[in-house]
């Protein structure tokens, strides 16, 4: 049910060649025109009459002729997609003819409700809790498993083809039953024919029947669980609290109903039933309404009804069951739907080849400023009286390491990206640990005051201190000019700022956490402590998710306010969490602070949380908003997705709307006047507008295929292992070991022979010689280093097949199917998809002769020697390998980076971090780095 946050354009199908567009051709009757002309009516009246006539015909056409959409299957087949109805209409609308499955589903639902009146009262809650858990598992686990296999392997479609579910030649009773069911459902659809539509569409319809049963059973069991919990709970709450609970619950239920209905309005049945897992549909969706309020609204705010029922029932049992069910839905989203969305709508595109950028003078780094920028830089420094400049003119060249200008290691974000070689990282962690050790101080008034003011001062420094630095940097580039004074270029100044900001962030949270821990007391005396702890934990989780979403959207550059320090052209876009909120950190970004205040129930923590909130709002108004206005100007939006949706939904009558606007204006005036006083007090009075920040795309991880171990299968008696053999092709003889050897990363060809009655699922795996102790069975997984021998035997790992017949063939191992490290290996021929070994090749070696750097070798010569090694590392990669030593290499795929890293280790006995390799950009740069490492190691003793 999740959909990508962009309009779906399923395929590049030429609609004109496939179907007639339902264009509305409005032919105005000549009699109408003649009549108006004869009556000598004015042009204005004539135009008005014609417009009314056109509108009537347009309405008539659009209401009588439904829009037909074209679907496209994975094999390229196109078809007109028959119109479908939603789940509730199919099951409960008496005007629609019911199929047998509809009757069965409704009967099952009635049975679930009937159990309420049959079982004893004490059994109702456990029974429905078990049923809800079972159907929720069937939903997230069962449907998730089916969709995962359909997305990656088209498993459901292949099953339908394998068992001839929709084949005209199938005469079985169940085939006739399915045919009758489908024809009943589409009896009024002229575009549907059971045997003519693609198998993907019929498979999807059959899958929908299963989904209907699971989803309706899940909902019914949850509803009966909620009803049972409501009847089993007895509270002594006052009447006004009970009415308040039910009123709030009813409002949440109404919101939940609107969210689901509006989401279905946008995505239709096609996305509601995961149609794009089966075929793509030519339709453009406008993601407005509920899709502008929250990401994946059907799985996020669309579950508000769960918590409404828990509130109305006043049951912790139902509340915890709702939390578990909701959490399972997010697991389903992250494991099943998000990878499919990324693969379908955001496929990886290889980069175009380009030349690597070179630094002209290796002894210095050019900032790349033109004459105008140099003059502006001089004016910046000369215009600040606090910066004294020597008589030497301003220089735009700084003696800095090459890697600083080109690429640097990712900065420390809280504790992420920790580097043991960076002293600042070690000091940051040490400061956090040292702060938390203060927890063991005596619990008295003195240390209460000390820890309180530690937390307060850390936050004040983070918002007020760093806020002043950012404000002055935005207005006068004060921070950068301070570094320019000492000959340090802007990027280095920005790196120092990153350390400042991260240390301040860490100390803000650790000092606040320390104070909370010291204020925590056992909650045994508070009757509402379970609710407070659950809500507190949820607020903390919301805080963490918001912070991660902000970082994912902004990247390191936006997280550390990079546009305050570096002149980088940015386009202001709104995606990720910023599609829904202008300032998510304003409220959601402090949710965990209030969660801890709720859990500790301490006045001191509450005061800190209140001040934390005010400081954050002041930071946004006085620092971020003026800078964003200065940089982006009129491109800043005023209303975020949530605000716009609420405004569009709440259309009040004119008198009420006028009063609401007057009240809103009064409140805004009070807030603005208060903020203006504070602004004038600190001397930062500037006009303000709504703010927004940069957006970056969220990349999803790719999951490598893995070979699952299965049990050993005994060799049939009619198979003679002597008929099987695996022989190596090519290679060179090692002088010392007398083994065949292959150069590091070189493709290895293998010829095999087999018995005529071999299995199509036989396969060959690559292993280290001593990893498997038994010659008869392989005990370790191949981890993807295997190849099938017959294209009909496996669904994957068939790219390595060079030739294949019944008794012999040839396969090639390259790319991911190779070991990218030196050692002694062997190939094993396995029987029938199992791990029973029928033949083993002779041992061979993967070698990497050491390249000597001790002599006088120049970078160009060394680069030419490294180039073929690097090219092999790009085997079966989506990136272009470099063709020349100065070609830019796209080291973005993790597997390619790992291979280059292993190659450098093997050939030069030098270990380089992946980030360093990415910074080199070309083979020539890598060669230069290796020569610099050689020079640096001269004179050192090991």
From Swiss-Prot:
Family: Belongs to the class VI-like SAM-binding methyltransferase superfamily. CHO2 family.
Top-tier EC class: transferase
Lumenal face residues: 1-99, 148-212, 260-292, 337-422, 471-496, 548-589
InterPro entries: Phopholipid_MeTrfase, Phosphatid-EA_MeTrfase_fun
Topological type in the membrane: Multi-pass membrane protein
Main function: Catalyzes the first step of the methylation pathway of phosphatidylcholine biosynthesis, the SAM-dependent methylation of phosphatidylethanolamine (PE) to phosphatidylmonomethylethanolamine (PMME).
EC numbers, comma separated: 2.1.1.17
GO biological process, one term: phosphatidylcholine biosynthetic process
Record organism: Yarrowia lipolytica (strain CLIB 122 / E 150)
Protein name: Phosphatidylethanolamine N-methyltransferase
GO molecular function, one term: phosphatidylethanolamine N-methyltransferase activity
């Amino acid at each position: 049910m999740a959909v990508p946050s962009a309009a779906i354009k399923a395929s590049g199908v030429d609609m004109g060649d496939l179907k007639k567009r339902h264009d509305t051709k409005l032919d105005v009757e000549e009699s109408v025109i003649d009549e108006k002309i004869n009556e000598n009516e004015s042009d204005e009246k004539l135009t008005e009459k014609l417009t009314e006539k056109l509108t009537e015909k347009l309405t008539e056409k659009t209401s009588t002729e439904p829009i037909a959409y074209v679907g496209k299957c994975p094999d390229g087949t196109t078809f007109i997609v028959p119109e479908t109805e939603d789940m509730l209409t199919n099951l409960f609308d008496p005007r629609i003819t019911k199929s047998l499955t509809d009757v069965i589903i409704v009967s099952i639902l009635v049975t679930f409700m009937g159990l309420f009146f049959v079982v004893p009262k004490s059994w109702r809650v456990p029974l429905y809790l078990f049923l809800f858990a079972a159907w929720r598992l069937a939903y997230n686990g069962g449907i998730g498993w089916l969709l995962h296999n359909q997305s990656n392997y088209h498993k459901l479609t292949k099953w339908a083809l394998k068992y001839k579910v929709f084949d005209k030649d199938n005469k079985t009773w169940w085939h006739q039953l399915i045919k009758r069911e489908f024809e009943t459902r589409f009896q009024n659809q002229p575009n549907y024919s059971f045997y003519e539509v693609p198998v993907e569409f019929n498979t999807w319809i059959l899958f929908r029947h299963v989904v209907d049963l699971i989803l309706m059973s899940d909902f019914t069991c949850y509803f009966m669980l909620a009803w049972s919990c409501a009847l089993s709970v007895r509270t002594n709450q006052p009447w006004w609290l009970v009415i308040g609970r039910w009123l709030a619950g009813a409002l949440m239920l109404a919101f939940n109903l609107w969210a689901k209905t509006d989401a279905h309005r946008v995505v239709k049945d096609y996305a509601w039933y995961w149609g794009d897992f089966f075929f793509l549909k030519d339709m453009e969706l406008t993601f407005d309404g509920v899709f502008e309020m929250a990401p994946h609204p059907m799985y996020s705010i669309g579950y508000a009804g769960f918590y409404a029922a828990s509130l109305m029932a006043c049951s912790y049992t139902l509340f915890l069951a709702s939390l578990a069910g909701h959490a399972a839905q997010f697991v389903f989203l992250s494991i099943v739907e998000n990878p499919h969305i990324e693969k379908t709508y955001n496929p990886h595109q290889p980069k175009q080849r380009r030349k690597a950028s070179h630094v002209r003078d290796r002894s210095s780094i050019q900032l790349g400023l033109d004459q105008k920028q140099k003059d502006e830089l001089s004016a910046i420094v000369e215009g600040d009286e606090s910066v004294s400049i020597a008589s030497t003119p301003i220089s735009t060249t700084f003696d800095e390491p090459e890697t600083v200008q080109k690429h640097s290691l990712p900065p420390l974000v809280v504790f992420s990206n920790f580097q043991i070689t960076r002293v600042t990282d070690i000091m940051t962690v040490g400061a956090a640990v040292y702060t938390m050790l203060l927890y063991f101080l005596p619990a008295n008034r003195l240390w209460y005051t000390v820890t309180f003011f530690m937390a307060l001062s850390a936050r004040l420094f983070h918002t007020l201190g760093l806020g002043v630095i950012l404000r002055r940097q935005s207005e006068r580039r004060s921070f950068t000019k301070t570094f320019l004074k000492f000959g340090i270029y802007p990027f280095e100044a920005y790196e120092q700022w990153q350390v400042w900001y991260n240390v301040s962030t860490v100390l803000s949270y650790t000092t606040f956490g320390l104070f909370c821990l010291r204020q925590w007391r056992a909650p045994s005396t508070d009757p509402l402590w379970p609710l407070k702890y659950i809500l507190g934990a949820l607020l903390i989780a919301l805080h963490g998710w918001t912070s991660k979403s902000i970082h994912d959207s902004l990247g390191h550059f936006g997280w550390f306010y990079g546009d305050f320090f570096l002149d980088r052209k940015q386009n202001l876009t709104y995606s990720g969490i910023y599609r829904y909120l202008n300032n998510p950190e304003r409220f959601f970004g402090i949710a965990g602070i209030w969660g801890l205040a709720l859990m500790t129930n301490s006045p001191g923590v509450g005061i800190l949380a209140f001040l934390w909130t005010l400081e954050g709002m002041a930071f946004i108004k006085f620092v971020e908003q003026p800078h964003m206005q200065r940089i982006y100007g009129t491109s800043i939006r005023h209303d975020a997705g949530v605000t716009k949706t609420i405004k569009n939904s709440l259309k009040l009558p004119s008198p009420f709307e006028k009063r609401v606007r007057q009240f809103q204006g009064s409140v805004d005036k009070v807030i603005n006047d208060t903020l203006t006083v504070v602004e004038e007090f600190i001397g930062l009075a500037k006009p303000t507008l709504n703010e927004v920040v940069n957006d970056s795309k969220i990349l999803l991880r790719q999951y490598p295929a893995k070979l699952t171990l299965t049990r050993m299968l005994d060799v049939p008696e009619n198979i003679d292992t002597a008929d099987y053999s695996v022989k190596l092709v090519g290679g060179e003889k090692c002088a010392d070991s007398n083994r065949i050897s292959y150069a590091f990363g070189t493709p290895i060809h293998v010829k095999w022979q087999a018995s005529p009655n071999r299995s199509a699922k036989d396969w060959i795996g690559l292993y280290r010689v001593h990893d498997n102790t038994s010659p008869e069975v392989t005990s370790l997984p191949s981890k993807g280093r295997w190849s099938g021998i017959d294209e009909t035997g496996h669904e994957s790992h068939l790219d390595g097949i060079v030739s294949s017949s019944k008794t012999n063939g040839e396969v090639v191992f390259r790319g991911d199917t190779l070991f990218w490290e030196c050692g002694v290996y062997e190939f094993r021929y396995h029987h029938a998809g199992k791990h029973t070994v029928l033949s083993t090749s002779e041992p061979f070696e993967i070698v990497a002769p050491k390249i000597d750097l001790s002599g006088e070798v120049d970078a160009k010569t060394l680069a030419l020697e490294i180039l073929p090694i690097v090219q092999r590392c790009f085997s079966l990669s989506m990136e272009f390998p470099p063709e020349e030593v100065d070609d830019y290499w796209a080291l973005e795929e993790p597997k390619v980076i790992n291979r280059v890293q292993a190659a450098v280790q093997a050939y030069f006995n030098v270990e380089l971090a992946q980030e360093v390799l990415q910074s080199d950009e070309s083979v020539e740069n890598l060669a230069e780095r290796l020569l610099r490492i050689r020079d640096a190691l001269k004179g050192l003793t090991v």
